[in-house]
Amino acid sequence: MTQIHYGLAALLVFFAASAGAAASRCHGTVNRGSIEGSVRLPAEGANFTAYSTLAVAMGRNHVHSEVSAIILDAYAKLEGAAPGAQYVYGESGNEYGGRFRPHRTHQSGTSVDFFVPVRDKNGQPARLPTPATQRFGYDIEFDRDARYGEYRIDFAAMAEHLVQLDLAARARGHGIALVIFDTAYLPRLFATSHGAQLKRLNFMKAKPWVRHDEHYHVDFAVPCDR
């Protein structure tokens, strides 16, 4: 075999290995599962950032490859659909799934938390601060008026995000299995221009074990081996 042929063969092996590594395989359920070949969400993009550089360094931003594609497709569409809006994603899961303390779920690579998009005291889009002193944002408490200090929840930007996540998931043959968000805020979310579309999503009706006011939890309907 010539040197050129050896080179071509090596490239074919490389691309075959890369293609195989790119596809994740999840097992079980969100509260009792695992994953093979998970991928890490980017730490930041044009209109989004991770909630913590430390958490990213610890590998707490692993997801199923299909979930990653859905999230990134949605963020790309949001650059045009919600110009100026700033998004922050939260916890997702471990590299191999399984128990992900302190969460009860996030075990199969198909669950992701997203911090609420906000506007500052001047009404401008902003990123919600998520310092370690407040458990990387999870200890933040919004009041009944959806305010926290100088920030208020941007329900329009949140609605647009959920719609784009749903569209991106459907475009890839999947969907959204569940959304968990503080039920007291749902009327304001449904009052946005995307209210009718959002009402078709499966929002948790019961009270969750912890208040979901500073973030919304999304389970993606990506199939896993049972």
Descriptions of predicted regions:
Residues 82-84, 107-111, 174, 213-215:
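Extracytoplasmic
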Residues 22-89, 154-170, 175-176:
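Active-site acidic/histidine clusters and adjacent loop/turn architecture
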Residues 14-19:
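N-terminal signal peptide c-region/cleavage motif recognized by signal peptidases
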Residues 70-101, 178-205:
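Extended, low-complexity, intrinsically disordered C-terminal regulatory tails
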Residues 56, 63, 93-97, 118-123, ...:
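Solvent-exposed loop/turn segments at secondary-structure junctions
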Residues 1-8:
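Bacterial N-terminal signal peptides that target proteins for export
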Residues 94-145:
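Acidic/His-rich structured neighborhood in mature extracellular/periplasmic domains
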Residues 124-226:
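Catalytic cores and adjacent binding grooves of peptidoglycan-active enzymes
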